[in-house]
Amino acid sequence: MRIQLLLVSTLVASIVATRVEDMATFRTEKQWQQDLQYRREFVKRQLAPKPKSNIVVSHTVSCVIDGGNMTSVWRFEGQFNPHIASEVILHDTSGLYNVPHEVQNDGQVLTVTVKRSAPADIAKVLISLKPVQLSSGQYECRPQLQLPWVPRPSSFMYDSYRLWYEKRWLTIILYVFMWTYLVTLLQYCIVRFIGTRLFYFLQRNITIRFTGKPTYNLLTYPVKG
């Protein structure tokens, strides 16, 4: 019964791990470096000189999820100098992940579009225009998906990210189930086939030594004392 239960648990863990790992978006080392580059560019933009002649009159925001990617468009009307493109910042709620985007500016209409390569699992994207002080400070686009944890530049945290957010822990659980099953099966074989024979062998010798009476080994042949 115990072996059957372990076998069923192993099968269920294998199916769940396979399904979840197939659905997970694995972040490669190249993508990891891109995240760090986005962070560096974000800091550079924060430290860059900011022009003072931008005015926002009105704005509209649209945000959709299309084909597994998030697309959003901010459209601002007003007066914008040519350098405003370098002052547009799109980021998630933590402020650590800079969302890839494109900016178009004709002086009176400023259009900011999230690239189609942006993942759809960002729950909230904020836009900042500096030095323009918008009425609410920031405008947001909020798709209905879970925000991913974006790793900081640390090898330990990167490994933790791959383990948890790419569902590698399910693989580890599967391995634990498999090894537990194999060890339990080995223990069962030892007790069932080797331990039983050894028990009868010792019982026969002890009986002969202390009683002098003949006994029978049920596994092999009758023994005469």
From Swiss-Prot:
The keyword Glycoprotein applies. Residues 18-170 are lumenal. Its main location: host cell. Glycans are attached at residue 69. Residues 192-225 are cytoplasmic. It is found in: Host endoplasmic reticulum membrane. Residues 1-17 form the signal peptide. Disulfide bonds join 63-141. Keywords: Disulfide bond, Glycoprotein, Host endoplasmic reticulum, Host membrane, Immunoglobulin domain, Membrane, Signal, Transmembrane, Transmembrane helix. GO terms for biological process: symbiont-mediated perturbation of host defense response. Residues 54-145 form the Ig-like H-type domain. Pfam families: CMV_US. Belongs to the cytomegalovirus US6 family. This is Membrane glycoprotein US7. It comes from Human cytomegalovirus (strain Merlin) (HHV-5).
